[in-house]
Amino acid sequence: FTEDVKGFSIGGPILEDKLFFYGAYEESEQPRFLAAGYAGSSNGVERPWLSKENHDRIENIAKDLYDYDPGGLPGDGAQTDEKYMLRVDWNINEQHDATVIYNYYDGVQLRSSDGDDNEFEFANHFYNKGAVSETTTVRLRSQWTDALSSEMFYSKNTMDDSQVTAGPRDFADMQISIGRDTVYLGADDSRQANALNTESDFFKVAGEYLLGDQVVTFGYERETLNVFNQFVQHARGGEYDFFDDSLANSAACQALTAQGRFDDSSCGLSGIDRFELGRPSRIYYGSGGG
């Protein structure tokens, strides 16, 4: 396979012997071999237990009966990354110098949700896993006297993590059993409502004093961490297993509400895409300091 990496760096003085800068940028892309298909499809890793007839039957039911496009056969994906760094160094005077550094990262990759040999998932059942991170650090070093020196350091980091289904979120996770094997379509049940954001701050002051043959150190530091974590499985509907019964639904059944479907024994579970099973959430928050 081929991995593409592009980048550059540049640096030099802004003010001679006083102020300097450095910057670097890099982007990369590498393939992820995710393609899969039915027997004889010549698309990635074929599933010998899945015939073209059954594949087309499931796809046509989704499109014609539920007005949902499952995305077709999945192709290979990619992982892309973008990152850059900026740095400034300042020689304030003979006693003091400062450094500021900024780092940025943005990466995403396409992943399969259920990719075992006994599983096949349409393309819209895949999901994109990504993260965006920013970090800023500031450092000030001081030599007050021959005996006394100090350092101040501050760092701030934010990170946004994402897991987003490749297709529409408003169609529940469907599992169609073919013997002991399974076909998946719809939004993966664990990627329908996800959010993870963190923000951390770190501050430190340290000093050192030479007292004769002794070295006295002192300092203070504080770290805070805020976390927001949301994971709502089945936010747009849970996992539903069916196959032949999906063809047997009458037109009248398709118009019933979710509750009506469960209460009416003459109806199958073919209207699952309309289900709203509530949106509970779990949120975590934490902070600490010392």
Q: Which residues make up each language-model segment?
A:
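Acidic, glycine-rich flexible loop segments
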Residues: 1-132, 144-146, 158-160, 173-177
